[in-house]
């Protein structure tokens, strides 16, 4: 089920800008590759990449791409319903629940994703790959796989009370 980005009040954040080169006979052709995260700070977040000769054009393309890849994030109050490990390539991000007032404890690119997803109290630890693309996509993977107690009860055909015991 795709989420329509036009109905959301999206904010965007440039996570990483990389200058890439194509070596040709006459020298090097430089381009810019940009990684952007978009989110409404209310449970929707997406990531996209864009490439162009000029940075503003690359950012525009990345934002367009990110709007096509928006996922819904399940939350319980200001945190995540349970701990989860998101994986992408060799990058792993462990997203953990936190008490109210903790804030967002996460490094670099992961922090941007969690803040734009609307999470206020959450901890994250990244393992493996330090590549911003892998870290951001691993975070998105983890957030997309989150489930609330209500979701699990519905899947099993039981009530929430039966699940919680």
Curated annotation (Swiss-Prot):
InterPro entries named in the record: Ribosomal_Su5_D2-typ_SF, Ribosomal_uS5, Ribosomal_uS5_bac-type, Ribosomal_uS5_C, Ribosomal_uS5_N, Ribosomal_uS5_N_CS, Ribsml_uS5_D2-typ_fold_subgr
Molecular-function annotations in GO = rRNA binding; structural constituent of ribosome
Q: Cite the entry's keywords alphabetically.
A: Ribonucleoprotein, Ribosomal protein, RNA-binding, rRNA-binding
- Per the database record, which ranges form the S5 DRBM domain? 10-73
Q: Which cellular component terms (GO) are annotated to the entry?
A: cytosolic small ribosomal subunit
Q: Which SUPFAM superfamilies does the annotation name?
A: dsRNA-binding domain-like, Ribosomal protein S5 domain 2-like
Alphabetically, which GO biological process terms does the record hold?
A: translation
Domain comment in the entry: The N-terminal domain interacts with the head of the 30S subunit; the C-terminal domain interacts with the body and contacts protein S4. The interaction surface between S4 and S5 is involved in control of translational fidelity.
Biological role stated in the UniProt entry = With S4 and S12 plays an important role in translational accuracy. Located at the back of the 30S subunit body where it stabilizes the conformation of the head with respect to the body.
Q: What family is it from?
A: Belongs to the universal ribosomal protein uS5 family.
Q: How does it assemble?
A: Part of the 30S ribosomal subunit. Contacts proteins S4 and S8.
Q: What is this protein called?
A: Small ribosomal subunit protein uS5
Q: Which organism is it from?
A: Clostridium botulinum (strain Hall / ATCC 3502 / NCTC 13319 / Type A)
Gene that encodes the chain: rpsE
């Amino acid at each position: 089920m795709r989420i329509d980005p036009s109905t959301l009040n999206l904010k965007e954040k440039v996570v990483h800008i990389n200058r890439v080169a194509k070596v040709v006979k006459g020298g090097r052709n430089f381009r810019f590759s940009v990684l952007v995260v978009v989110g409404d700070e209310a449970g929707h977040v997406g990531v996209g990449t864009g490439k162009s000769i000029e940075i503003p054009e690359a950012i525009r393309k990345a934002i367009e791409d990110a709007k096509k890849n928006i996922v819904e994030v399940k939350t319980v109050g200001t945190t995540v319903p349970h701990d989860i490990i998101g994986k992408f390539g060799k990058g792993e991000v462990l997203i953990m629940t936190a008490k109210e007032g903790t804030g967002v404890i996460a490094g670099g690119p992961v922090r941007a994703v969690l803040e734009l997803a609307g999470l206020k109290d959450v901890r994250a630890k990244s393992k493996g790959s330090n590549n911003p693309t892998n870290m951001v996509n691993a975070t998105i993977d983890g957030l997309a796989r989150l489930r609330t107690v209500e979701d699990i009860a519905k899947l099993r055909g039981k009530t929430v009370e039966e699940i919680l015991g």
